[in-house]
Amino acid sequence: NPIPILTPC
């Protein structure tokens, strides 16, 4: 994921 803070994984 390019934005790990917005994604749970």
UniProtKB/Swiss-Prot annotation:
GO terms for molecular function: DNA binding; metal ion binding; methylated-DNA-[protein]-cysteine S-methyltransferase activity. Keywords: DNA damage, DNA repair, DNA-binding, Metal-binding, Methyltransferase, Nucleus, Transferase, Zinc. Its cofactor is Zn(2+). It is an enzyme of class 2 (transferase). The active site is at C9. The keyword Methyltransferase applies. GO terms for cellular component: nucleus. Its main location: nucleus. Binds 1 zinc ion. It is found in: Nucleus. Its EC number is 2.1.1.63. It comes from the Eukaryota. The keyword Metal-binding applies. GO terms for biological process: DNA repair; methylation. It catalyses: a 6-O-methyl-2'-deoxyguanosine in DNA + L-cysteinyl-[protein] = S-methyl-L-cysteinyl-[protein] + a 2'-deoxyguanosine in DNA; a 4-O-methyl-thymidine in DNA + L-cysteinyl-[protein] = a thymidine in DNA + S-methyl-L-cysteinyl-[protein]. Belongs to the MGMT family. This enzyme catalyzes only one turnover and therefore is not strictly catalytic. According to one definition, an enzyme is a biocatalyst that acts repeatedly and over many reaction cycles. Involved in the cellular defense against the biological effects of O6-methylguanine (O6-MeG) and O4-methylthymine (O4-MeT) in DNA. Repairs the methylated nucleobase in DNA by stoichiometrically transferring the methyl group to a cysteine residue in the enzyme. This is a suicide reaction: the enzyme is irreversibly inactivated. This is Methylated-DNA--protein-cysteine methyltransferase. It comes from Bos taurus (Bovine).
